[in-house]
């Protein structure tokens, strides 16, 4: 029942050929009753995978003797790999190797329903879940009978994450001398900042005043050399600035000077921040956010606008967007007044499947996409937009001050911030933060006689040797040895080994020639290589070479108390009537098997959602975690830093509390004592994220909870894709077409033509 880690792919793995496969409808079939319930998973998070394993073990240990056990089936290729696997098993009527449940997105239900293989969770008690987050089941194509076919158990949304010190330097450089600031901050911030030469003004409304005050606070934190001693402060809707320990400097000069090394000199130019008025409301809609980002790019030509061929060590732009499709979908949906009839596609009640005619016939969604794209296009032309391509997330760069702000998943908190005096591995044209679960590889010294020994690393006080060719007798693959087969990696390690040997036999310290890790780093087969796992490892082992290790000063990196976390822009333009939010995440989806297994599947799902258990920590989890009674669903989402849409969590009259466990850097929302009080006010002037402490406050989850609460109370409209067997291809192709346009800088007409061509004729049916 061990899980492997697989990197979720961001581009459709099946494309048009998979679309044709999906169009081939087969009749319902029964699976062979093998006496177990198989749960298919493509989880990539180590904590989520371990939590799921714990849940399954708990069920198997406590179920009634006659109940079927649960078995986890790992699917390669991420969520797209899971979609492809379901299509294959349905089309081939795989009766022996199919599964009963899968963690994936609702479009799989549409694929299953075409062959009557979707399992209706009738009889499962979903009363604990808020109906606003179950209603998407009515927007799944192909469903013949109303019901619950997909259950959201790991929800997230997208957030705006501002690098406070970077934005402070930008605004402080551009603002007019004597621009009003809040009385509190003006009294405490040193006036030794660089001489003002700009004409930017900061609006004096209350929301902007609070936001500017928080931006200044983050710059103070970045200047502060005593950050490790800073006390965490509980915050409420009335709090306006952080409290610091005695001796903490209130000067922002050090921070500004450090950021200036990255961003260069501010230039007062037309089309930039010249004569601009900064307002908090800028971040509430895409139109103004993109205009602001474009003005910043134009104001820093030496480091942003004029840099066309960026390396990973350069500024990546002003705004980072981790999911292009989410950004486009949210903006177009908001521009269409949050009405699914004005979106790219919606489920046609007559046919039961998605109708793409609104877009393909150039109706409202096409026109809104043109407006949205043209706003992005100005930023693209100024080289100010960074988009995620295949796992290169904004967090990788914003934490090193290479972006000013970004839109990213609320599940990404643990990736966004560097530790004090963080280390990173620097290559010739990019760098990565020093990964967790990493060991150094030493070259053999001249006294070691094995000619095919490439290097050694130590794991739990045990030496693990790396060999080429073959493993000598007395050593065992996966136990104390790993055989290296990649010729490029062998060559790099060989050269380092020979260089070390040339130092002479008197050398007593083995040279570090590389690093090895089981963390989730991108394999490129140039600097980072995938190798065999050790026998007891769940996740793929990698070897990192050609890297220089460097330790960074705190002011060179983003800490959690230097960020400002806001909602993703909820409108396209400020005049839009409704605010929207993205709701996303894999669902628990049932698959028809046979009468007995269907009953056993629903029995497990009902237990998962409703059975309260106290002793979760007895199963290889944190010793210091709380013992609060919770269901398996609550435990899973808490451990994975996601949100379970429980009615009680979204009770309008109750306070939302941010909580966390105490012994992991992958932070969670759990039932421990509160470490931060979250305001019900989702205004732009959000407080900076507090300094990470032993309570590990997860401000991303806190902000997401605020938004989900508003959606539950109909104060904001949650968007989720109408689900059809084709919508995954549509989403992936609009994302890849947009990302390509960021490079090529093509006009809207060329972008949209490339996108439509990529869809093929199957979308006009």
From Swiss-Prot:
| Record region (Disordered) | 177-203, 218-255
Q: Which residues form the signal peptide?
A: 1-22
What are the lipidation residues for N-palmitoyl cysteine?
Answer: 23
Record's keyword terms, sorted: Cell membrane, Lipoprotein, Membrane, Palmitate, Signal
Q: Where is the lipid attached (S-diacylglycerol cysteine)?
A: 23
Please note every region of biased composition (Low complexity): 236-247
Q: InterPro entries, alphabetically?
A: Lipoprotein_10_C (IPR004890), Mycoplasma_lipoprotein_cen_dom (IPR004984), P68-like (IPR054825)
Composition bias of kind Polar residues appears in 179-192
* GO CC terms in record: plasma membrane
Does Secreted appear among the keywords? no
Name the principal localization, coarsely classed.
membrane
Q: Where in the cell is it found?
A: Cell membrane
The membrane topology of this protein is: Lipid-anchor
Keyword Signal belongs to the record: yes
Q: Which domain of life is it from?
A: Bacteria
Its family remark reads:
Belongs to the MG185/MG260 family.
NCBIfam families per the UniProt record, alphabetical: lipo_P68 (NF045826)
Name of this chain's protein: Uncharacterized lipoprotein MG260
| Biological classification of the source | Bacteria, Bacillati, Mycoplasmatota, Mycoplasmoidales, Mycoplasmoidaceae
């Amino acid at each position: 029942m061990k899980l492997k880690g697989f990197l979720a792919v961001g581009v459709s793995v099946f494309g048009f050929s998979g679309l044709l496969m999906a169009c081939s409808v087969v009749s319902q079939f029964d699976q062979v009753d093998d006496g177990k319930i198989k749960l298919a998973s493509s989880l990539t998070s180590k904590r989520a995978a371990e939590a799921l394993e714990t849940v399954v073990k708990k069920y198997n240990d406590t179920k009634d003797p006659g109940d079927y056990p649960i078995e986890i089936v790992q699917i390669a290729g991420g969520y797209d790999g899971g979609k492809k696997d379901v299509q294959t098993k349905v089309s081939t009527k795989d009766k022996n190797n199919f599964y009963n449940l899968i963690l994936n997105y609702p479009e799989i239900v549409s694929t299953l329903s075409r062959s009557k293989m979707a399992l209706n969770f009738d009889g499962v008690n979903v009363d604990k879940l808020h109906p606003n987050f179950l209603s998407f089941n009515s927007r799944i194509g192909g469903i013949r009978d109303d019901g619950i076919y997909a259950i959201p158990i790991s929800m997230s949304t997208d957030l705006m994450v501002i690098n406070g010190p970077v934005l402070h330097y930008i605004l402080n450089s551009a603002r007019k001398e004597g621009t009003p600031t809040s009385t509190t901050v003006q009294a405490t911030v040193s006036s030794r900042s660089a001489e003002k030469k700009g004409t930017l003004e900061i609006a004096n409304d209350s929301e902007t005043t609070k936001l500017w005050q928080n931006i200044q606070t983050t710059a103070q934190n970045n200047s502060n050399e005593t950050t490790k001693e800073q006390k965490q402060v509980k915050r409420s809707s009335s709090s306006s600035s952080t409290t610091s320990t005695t001796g903490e400097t209130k000067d922002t000069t050090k921070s500004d000077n450090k950021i200036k090394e990255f961003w260069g000199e501010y230039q007062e130019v037309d089309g930039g921040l010249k004569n601009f008025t900064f307002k908090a409301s800028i971040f509430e809609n895409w139109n103004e956010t993109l205009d602001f980002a474009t003005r910043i790019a134009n104001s820093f030509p030496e480091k942003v606008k004029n840099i066309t061929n960026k390396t990973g060590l350069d500024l990546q732009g002003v705004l980072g967007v981790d999911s292009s499709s989410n950004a486009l979908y949210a903006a177009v949906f908001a521009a269409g007044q949050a009405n699914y009839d004005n979106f790219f596609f919606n489920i046609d009640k007559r046919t039961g499947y998605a109708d793409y005619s609104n877009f393909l016939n150039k109706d409202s969604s096409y026109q809104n996409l043109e407006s949205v794209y043209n706003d992005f296009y100005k930023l693209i032309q100024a080289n100010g937009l960074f988009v995620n391509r295949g796992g290169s997330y904004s967090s990788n760069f914003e934490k090193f001050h290479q972006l000013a702000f970004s839109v990213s998943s609320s599940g990404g908190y643990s990736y966004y911030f560097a530790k004090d005096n963080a280390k990173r591995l620097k290559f010739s044209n990019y760098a990565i933060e020093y990964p967790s679960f990493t060991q150094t590889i030493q070259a053999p010294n001249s006294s070691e006689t094995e000619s095919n020994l490439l290097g050694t690393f130590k794991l739990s006080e045990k030496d693990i040797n790396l060999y080429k060719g073959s493993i000598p007798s007395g050593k065992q693959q996966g136990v104390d040895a790993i055989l290296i087969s990649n010729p490029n990696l062998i060559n790099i390690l060989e050269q380092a080994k020979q260089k070390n040997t040339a130092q002479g036999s008197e050398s007593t310290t083995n040279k570090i020639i590389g690093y090895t890790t089981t963390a989730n780093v991108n394999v490129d087969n140039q600097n980072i290589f995938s190798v065999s796992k050790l026998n007891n490892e769940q996740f793929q082992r990698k070897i990192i070479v050609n890297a220089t290790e460097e330790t960074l000063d705190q002011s060179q990196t983003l800490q959690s108390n230097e960020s400002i976390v806001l909602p993703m822009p909820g409108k396209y333009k400020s005049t839009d009537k409704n605010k929207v939010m993205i709701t996303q995440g894999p669902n628990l989806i049932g698959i028809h098997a046979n009468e007995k297994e269907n009953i056993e599947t629903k029995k497990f799902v009902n237990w998962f959602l409703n059975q309260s258990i106290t002793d979760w920590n007895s199963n290889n989890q944190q010793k210091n975690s709380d013992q609060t009674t919770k269901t398996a669903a609550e435990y899973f989402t808490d451990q994975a830093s996601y949100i379970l849409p429980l009615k009680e969590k979204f009770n309008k009259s109750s306070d939302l509390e941010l909580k966390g466990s105490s012994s992991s850097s992958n932070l969670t929302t759990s039932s421990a004592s509160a470490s931060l009080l979250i305001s019900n006010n989702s205004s732009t002037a959000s407080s900076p994220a507090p300094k990470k402490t032993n309570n590990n406050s997860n401000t991303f989850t806190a902000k997401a909870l605020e938004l989900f609460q508003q959606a539950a109370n109909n104060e904001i409209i949650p968007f989720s894709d109408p689900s059809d067997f084709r919508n995954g291809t549509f989403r992936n192709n609009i994302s890849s077409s947009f990302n390509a346009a960021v490079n090529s800088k093509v006009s809207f007409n060329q972008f949209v033509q490339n996108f439509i061509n990529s869809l093929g004729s199957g979308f006009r049916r």
